[in-house]
């Protein structure tokens, strides 16, 4: 998740980016973006890399025009390349939302590295809150004898926290890709679509529909 342009300018909105790539050589195979402004520009860049048989490493090297009202200093395309490169190089062990759903909580430690205020607004069940800024001072609270699963809002702080733990001797540390934002988007049930079969019907027909629905509600 990256901003469509510099965050200190009005109306900066996050875009969610998904890419597929070969684990063997990093060849970029596909890309998908959900967002608002700037989506078309970024998907064009991905398509050009795919057209020329490029890799995720090429995403890091792309040169984009930059102006704060229209883009970020670290462009979302480049950030996507950084994340994929870290996975391929073994600098980060990714945790995908499907894995989290089936995890055996007796065998892992789930750590929320967001701030206490963010944690209070909602967190994953079973998570302990150790903010990134406190990680070095409080890492002794995290057991070393089982895997550690980290998450934050969108993935960046989880990545930084995983580096701290790995540098201090922890062996199996995974970071939730896309953070809590992606997890909620992927696991929250979609609302049932409304029925529009009577759209455009006459006023008399609409009246009949309204009465029948009212009767049904009353009976229930």
Regions found by a protein language model. Give the residues of each.
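Structured beta-strand/loop patches that form or line metal/cofactor-binding pockets in enzymes
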Residues: 1-24
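Histidine- and/or cysteine-centered catalytic micro-motif in compact active-site loops
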Residues: 1-2, 114-116
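Glycine-rich phosphate/pyrophosphate-binding beta-alpha loops
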Residues: 3-7, 32-40, 67-69
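Hydrophobic "anchor" residues
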Residues: 27-28
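A short, polar/charged loop-to-alpha-helix boundary motif
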Residues: 37-56
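Rhodanese-like catalytic fold shared by cysteine-dependent sulfurtransferases
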Residues: 54-109, 116-149, 153-220
């Amino acid at each position: 998740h990256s901003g469509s342009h510099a965050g200190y300018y009005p109306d900066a909105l996050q875009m969610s980016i998904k890419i597929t790539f070969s684990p063997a050589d990093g060849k970029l195979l596909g890309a998908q973006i959900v967002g608002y402004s700037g989506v078309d520009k970024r998907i064009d860049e991905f398509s050009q890399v795919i057209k020329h048989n490029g890799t995720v490493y090429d995403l890091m090297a792309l040169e984009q025009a930059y102006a704060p009202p229209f883009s970020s200093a670290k462009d979302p395309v480049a950030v996507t390349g950084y994340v994929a490169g870290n996975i391929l190089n073994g600098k980060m062990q990714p945790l995908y939302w499907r894995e989290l759903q089936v995890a055996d909580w007796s065998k892992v430690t789930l750590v929320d590295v967001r701030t206490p205020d963010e944690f209070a607004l909602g967190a994953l069940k079973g998570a302990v809150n150790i903010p990134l800024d406190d990680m070095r001072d409080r890492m002794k609270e995290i057991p070393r004898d089982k895997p550690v699963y980290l998450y934050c809002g969108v993935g960046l702080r989880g990545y930084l926290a995983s580096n701290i733990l790995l540098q201090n001797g922890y062996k199996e540390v995974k970071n939730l890709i896309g953070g809590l934002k992606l997890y909620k988007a992927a696991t929250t049930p979609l609302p049932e679509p409304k029925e529009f079969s009577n759209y455009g019907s006459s006023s008399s027909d609409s009246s009949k529909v309204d009465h029948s629905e009212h009767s049904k509600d009353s009976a229930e």
